[in-house]
Every structure is written in structure tokens, then in C-alpha cells.
Amino acid sequence: MIAEFEHLFDQTRAAFGQERTFLRAKALAMSALVALGRHTISGMLCASAQQFVDWSAAYRLFEQQRFDRAALFAPVRRTVLERLQPHQPLVAMMDDTLIRKRGRKVYGTGWRRDPLGPHFTANFVWGQRFLQISAALPSAPTGPGQARGVPIDLVHAPSAARPRKNAPAEVWKEYRRQQQSMKISAVGAGQLAALRHRLDGEASGKDRPLIMPVDGGFTNRAVFRCAPPNTILIGRVRKDARLFSAE
């Protein structure tokens, strides 16, 4: 398993600008496989016997876009396409996920509705919101069967920061604009278009249909009106939803 993991991770070298940054990320990724408890940066450093060295370089790795996120997931996406039959479509699932945090000054954190809370009340937790796309890798080459979800994209999707009440009108106008562009549905539409663009740029995915099941938060005009070509969207809606023709 280690040899296969190294072979796969070595293909992500183009995502890092420096060799030392790539080696540091590779060590942390290997540590994530064997770390016990919560897979935090400190936990991965301890798993790789780096608890007595300076941790600042490991934390800076995840700051200021020190690696290309799209290039990091590209080898995983290509490997999934290679395992599919030529006539098979790529089935990918898109949904937002919540990562709980404790620090009040962590970028992008806020009060979010707890998806694991009871249905009879609204619980709120402090955390960060991410948008994840996972490709369905079938267990059998042909015919119906089980599939495993393999993450091929992950993007931070924070909400717009609300200004003060006495902020200038220009600040509030910019806030309203950011509210629309940073909605989870708008972010999902952008990532869906980006995935289709990356597939069209690869020989194994250029003519392959993309089937994307989404949750109810993405079953709206922001996503369906911007659906790229050769893409099928399957959205979950409420039973009392009203459907209208796009014309």
C-alpha cells in the first residue's frame, strides 16, 4: 500500500513550486495514514517523529496558496478515469461539508447549522464550510454494483463577512455582491464547470458524459441554468416543490 501511495503522490509534484515543499507535504500525507486520533497538523507531525522540531514550516504549507489545489487532485481524477470503461460515464457527487473549529479567529469560520442535530430543533456549531466533489469508482467493471466515493476536489466555501451597522454604503453594496457570489450554490456551479473543463482537456474524459447527483441546496437556478454541456444533473427536491419551465 505504501508503494502505491508513493506512486500516486509522486504524480502531484507539479502542484508544488519547490521540492522541499513537496517533500514536506508528502511526509504529512504519509503520516495521515498512520496517525491516531484527530488528524490535525500537530498529530501528523507527531506520527512522523517531528514533534521536537520547528512546526512553523508545516503550518505555513497550508497558507497563502503554497500549492495548486487543482493539480493536487488531478492524478486522482485521471486514475479514476483510467479504471472506467470507455463507454462508462463519470458519476460524481457534490455536497458541502462542515469541519468544526474552536478558534474564533480562524479564517472562514462561523456559526453553521449542525447537520447531525436532531430534526425537531436547529443546532448551531462553529466551523468552516467546504465543498467536496467525489467520483464514484465502481467495484465491478461492468453491470450494477457497489461504488466507492473518491474525493477529486475540495474547496473552502466561506460566507461573506457581514460589515458593521454604521459601515459606508459602498461597503454594504460590496457585501451584497459577495453574498451572491459566495453562496454555496454559486460555488458549486463554478466547481461543476471547472470539473467539466478539466475533463474536456483530457483524452480519457473529453467525450465522457458527467453525471452529477446533488443535494437540495444545489437544486436551483444558480446551478441548473449554468450546467455545462455533456453533463447530467440529478437534484433532490422537496415533495412540495414547484417546477416551472425555463422558458
Predicted regions: what they are:
Residues 1-247:
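Conserved, well-structured functional cores that handle cations and Mg-NTP chemistry
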